[in-house]
């Protein structure tokens, strides 16, 4: 590399560092810890729980894997067991020299569950025993109620990337009422060295009206919550460097209660992100039951390609008035530099 090339690279590095220092959004100082009482949306407890098929089946665990993630699924509830990123690892594993990938979902502490209203009572899908069949990159589960009605769940993992397609087919089930209920919860674990920064994990969402993006406060020391009484096109759990997203395909969530709770005395589950979501049972009966999960890095070049309106806004590039400069100059320049240096460590957040 000649002298002019070295000089050029040094100037580019200086420009990036100067931009980061003078223009990047400053972190908001942590507020004093306080307790917020929040109202949450929960299913009514007056409905009886419907009986399920009493034939107990042995649990099976299925694995879907591509070049980027490993997904494990259980026939017990046709549910997610774990989602692991293959090419990333936590700070703890890095410090200890372990090669294990980084988990963004683990059923031991996290939850994704669906509750359906039926003529016989409410059905918690996670309580059903399913029979599973795997064919290539797809796993399909079939469960049967005591009434003989069946529910089918399927998961499809593409050959690469961080998206997981999920479908719940309940068209043969006699659903009653106008809504069904989704509960999604994640216990945020420490993946980087600075635990205070990681406690700024939050919940992002996109309102259907005018595709308006918003989020809960990124406060590391106090509870943040929001009751959304209007429809949303997607909801995501945003950490500093990683993201978990839930995107309904062809329909929108009717409402949601969102809560982010820092666990100040817990060094393992450092923050709880919780979304209690209401969706239309009529949509479900009509076959509008496809979802897409995103489990991956909070990388603009990846997140912006997800086929969901304004999903790229999960990555905070800069202040709004500087966004065009960041988006069309610095992001492409950053990508070019990364193509030259395999160990390029600068990061614009």
Enumerate the predicted regions with their spans.
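Membrane-interface junctions
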Residues: 3, 284, 339-343
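Short, Gly/Pro- and small/polar-rich lid/capping loops
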Residues: 38-62
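Soluble non-transmembrane domains of integral membrane proteins
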Residues: 65-316
